Every structure is written in structure tokens, then in C-alpha cells.
Amino acid sequence: MFKSLYTRIAIYTITVMIFSAVASFLCTNIIYHNYLKENNDAKIMRTLKDSIQYQKESRIEASAPFFKHLGEMNYQVMTISEDGHRTYYGTEFRKDNISKKTAESVLHGKDYHGIKNLPYNPIITGFFENTTKNTVGIAYQSKGHTYAVFMRPDIGKTFSEFRIFLAILITLLLLFSIILVISSTYAIIKPIQQLKRATERLMHGNFDEVIHVTRKDEFGTLQYRFDKMRLSLKQLDDMRQHFVQNVSHEIKTPLTHIHHLLDLLKFAKTDNAREQYIEEIYEVTTQLSELTKALLLLSEIDNGAHLDFDDDIQLNQLIKKIIRHEQFSANEKDLIIMSDLETISMNGNERLLHQAFQNLITNAIKYSTTGGMVDVTLSQNLETITCTITDDGQGMSAETQARIFERFYKSSNHDNSNGLGLAIAKAIFELHHGTITVDSEKNAGTTFTITFKKVPKTIS
């Protein structure tokens, strides 16, 4: 029953209405008991005394017709004679609970203020308590006899038409309130139901249907943010599919090549041919191994919450180490690697930064012309640390520069790389609050600029 938010809000609202009505009744009852009851008692007592005085001044001897007339004027009257006989006029009392002692007290001339002294009852308002105890009383003398006269307003007759009006009013009030509560609840719940359906579509991979903003309140903000989330999920899903396609292609191509080489090896007739095929198979499997390592590293970076960035890194020493390691590759192309490295330290993940800078320096050597030069600089100011890696290779077009950091992007079909090196480097630098930019012109070389924001070291 309460699994639906629509039902829950409607029931809660109606419950609040009922609770408010009960609380209002109790508060009104308390106000009547503490502030209005005494005034009501005095007013009815004054009416009774004025009526008796009028009867005396009018020299009306017969008391029964007079009290009957009071009953017809929407009052309930009870008289008690000296011998205890009780007579009722007007509408019958629900209960006669005036004690004999009280009657005798009134017969002896003491006024009775039953309305003022009626005990508090949280369930029934004293104004509507239709008992002889809830009356005012005085002594009345007629033809040499004394009577105790008790009187209260006949609420039933006095407010008979008003009660019908009030009953209709309350019924319509409740009816319209319930209808409006249900309608307003539906208006509140409708955008939530739309978002619920939208999340179900997202769960099933449907990222194309737009979530429209239909309101300008908090629900509208929620709709807007859900639609932004949908777009982000769509982008991630597109990237995932593209990634899977690229990985499949990068794995399928060398596997096909290996399969072809194995067929050739199977039917090779000379030892030289067999050695050549084995060497080519080794090269292809090495490429596959490098691709696997790169994919594992990407996965580690993408799920980087567990990574530690507390290593105290001597950045200049790290770059020098990479240059020494790659010196053999540079010598094979008669390259000169120039370096101007300031002594700089920073906190981070040394293993990842080593991989990122190695990717950049390896690329610079790979794409530099034979006999050329690679220039590496490292400097800092008060706010940033900057490293530049420049080669004098063939450069790249504006289109290539715009896409160079995309995963699996290759500027040429003849490129035997896996297209992940720069994407990995960029992701690593961003994990270290850094950025990487490229500046290149065709046949004029390429410069990669890495900038880190200085982060104050925390004292543990």
C-alpha cells in the first residue's frame, strides 16, 4: 500500500488534515473551558433572571405556560418543586443528573452555575453537553410555592439550520480537499514518475530519449541534471563501444598476422625463411604484450581511487633516468638529446609519472629525423612546474593536434604504435593536477608542454 509515493503523500496529507482537525477541536475545547464558559454561564443566568423578572412584572400567574413559552424560544427548562417533582419544558435533556442536594440549595435561594463549573471533558465541548447539570438555576416563587428553575440554551434548535449548513460545508470542504490533495499529489509525483521511467530506460541502455524540463522548481533542476547525466552516460557508452571496437581491432589485426605467419612457417622450406617468420611472430607478440600492458595501465588510471600520490619525487632525476635509458635508441638515429633541468621535487606517483614522461621522450626520439635533436627542459615559478619536450621531426597537422590525445588515435595507418601512449600520458598528468598541450607545425617539429600546479605539501 505504501510502496507508491503517490499513495504515501496522499495518505500522509489526509492524515495531517485529520490530525489538524482533532488538534483544533481539542484546542477550541480548552479555550471554551478556560475563557468562554464563564461568560456563557453569566449570559444565560442573566437571561433567566430577566425572564423571571419579566414574568413577575407582567403579573403572569400561571408558571407552566410561561416555562413552556421559554421552551418554544429554544431553551431547555427544568423545574423542581419543594416536594422534588421535576417538570421539563422544551427539548428533552439527554440526561438528568442534577443532584437532590443541588436542587435543595437552589430552593433555599442559592444561584446554581452549572455551566461555569462543568468539569473539563476533552471529548465533548461543554457548550454541547445536553444534561441538566450543564445549566444555570435560580429559585422561583409562584402562588406561595418555591421552585428551583434550571435552564440552558437548546443548541439543537438554535443551530438546527446552521448545523445543516455546517455539515454541508465540512463535507464539501473534506471532499474538495481530498480531490485537490490527490490532484496536487499527482502533479508533484508526475515528474518523479517521468524520472523513474527515464532511469529504467537508462538501465536498459537507451540514452537517446531526451528528459524534458517541465518545471522551474527543484523538480525542474532535477530533470535538468538527469538529462545532463543521460548525456554523460551516452558519451561514456559511446566511448566504451568505440574503445571495445578499437581494442578488438588492435588485437584482431596482429592475431590475424600471427595466424598468417604460422601458416607460412608451416610450409617454409628453408631455415632462413623459418627464422624470418619466427622473428616476425616475435615482433607481433611483443606488440600484443605492449598493448596488454597499456590497457592494464589505462584500467588502473581510470579506477584511480586506490592509487597513492605521496611519493616524494625528484622530477629532474626521474627525467635524467629516462634519458639515459633511451640513449641507445637516440644513438641508433644519431640524435642529440639536450636537457636543461632545474632541481625540482613534487609529490605524486613516481611509477606513473615515469611512464608518462617515458612515453613522451620515446615518441620524440621515434619521430625525430636522423641526426636531429631532442630538447628537454624543466623549470618552475612560484605557482607552477613546467616541462617541455621538443623534437625536430616532421610535425603534425591541426587536425592531428586536435585528436592526438584520443585513445587509439593514429595519425597514419602505417604507424605501428597502439595509439595509447599520449592518452595514457595525458591521463597521468591530469591525476597529478597537471595539463599537457601540443604545439606543432608541418616540417617544423613538435613541442609538448606539461604544466603542474604546485600543491602545498601536507604535514602528517
From Swiss-Prot:
Domain HAMP: 186-238
Annotated ranges, domain Histidine kinase: 246-456
TM region(s), chain numbering: 11-31, 164-184
InterPro entries per UniProt: Bact_Sensor_His_Kinase, HAMP_dom, HATPase_C_sf, His_kinase_dom, HisK_dim/P_dom, HisK_dim/P_sf, Sig_transdc_His_kin-like_C
Residues recorded as bearing Phosphohistidine in the entry: H249
Localization, UniProt: Cell membrane
Keywords: ATP-binding, Cell membrane, Kinase, Membrane, Nucleotide-binding, Phosphoprotein, Transferase, Transmembrane, Transmembrane helix, Two-component regulatory system, Virulence
Any one GO cellular component localisation term in the record: plasma membrane
Presence of the UniProt keyword Transferase in the record: yes
Protein modification: Autophosphorylated.
Lipid bilayer topology: Multi-pass membrane protein
Gene3D superfamilies cross-referenced by the UniProt entry: 1.10.287.130, 6.10.340.10, Histidine kinase-like ATPase, C-terminal domain (3.30.565.10)
Class of this enzyme: transferase
E.C. number(s) listed in UniProt: 2.7.13.3
Pfam families documented for this protein: HAMP (PF00672), HATPase_c (PF02518), HisKA (PF00512)
Physiological role: Member of the two-component regulatory system HssS/HssR involved in intracellular heme homeostasis and tempering of staphylococcal virulence. HssS functions as a heme sensor histidine kinase which is autophosphorylated at a histidine residue and transfers its phosphate group to an aspartate residue of HssR. HssR/HssS activates the expression of hrtAB, an efflux pump, in response to extracellular heme, hemin, hemoglobin or blood.
Protein name: Heme sensor protein HssS
Natural source organism: Staphylococcus saprophyticus subsp. saprophyticus (strain ATCC 15305 / DSM 20229 / NCIMB 8711 / NCTC 7292 / S-41)
